[in-house]
Amino acid sequence: MSNRVGLASSLKDGQKYMDLWPVRKELNSIFPEQRIIKATRFGVKVMPAIAAISVLTQMVFNNYQAMPQAVVMALFAISLPLQGMWWLGNRSNTKLPPALVSWYRELHEKITETGFALEPMKSRPRYKELAIILNRAFRQLDKSSMERWF
């Protein structure tokens, strides 16, 4: 998608990659993405509430001596989903290892053989291109043609 470097671009790429990656049980044993995506989505929903509760609890009980620890705990809770998105963003821009490159090429060829239009095959694909191909394969190929890989 882009060659930008930095925290903001990694977080943005991580969000896109989270939506792009096919959440399928067949991929669980091969890739850690599904576990990271599930934990990150859970963290996005839950961690802001935990952060607020940790600070508000100290305020309600007038325990201002523990406020610094509560703020640190809140910052840590908020950082957890950000860490997941950062990891996913970096992973999406990582070049595939040679074994996965051949798998990417086989899947790409199989999809184009069945007559579906795809963007041209990349010479040095990244994980985000693999996610696109896997998504397309699960949507458009039948189970018998996918049995070879899963």
Swiss-Prot record:
Membrane-crossing residue ranges in chain numbering: 42-62, 70-90
Annotated keywords: Cell inner membrane, Cell membrane, Membrane, Transmembrane, Transmembrane helix
Pfam families: DUF412
GO cellular component, one term: plasma membrane
Subcellular location, record wording: Cell inner membrane
Membrane topology reported for the UniProt record: Multi-pass membrane protein
Cystine bridges: none
Family under the similarity heading: Belongs to the UPF0208 family.
Cited NCBIfam families: PRK01816.1 (NF002493)
Protein name: UPF0208 membrane protein VS_0999
Species, as recorded: Vibrio atlanticus (strain LGP32)
Organism phylogeny: Bacteria, Pseudomonadati, Pseudomonadota, Gammaproteobacteria, Vibrionales
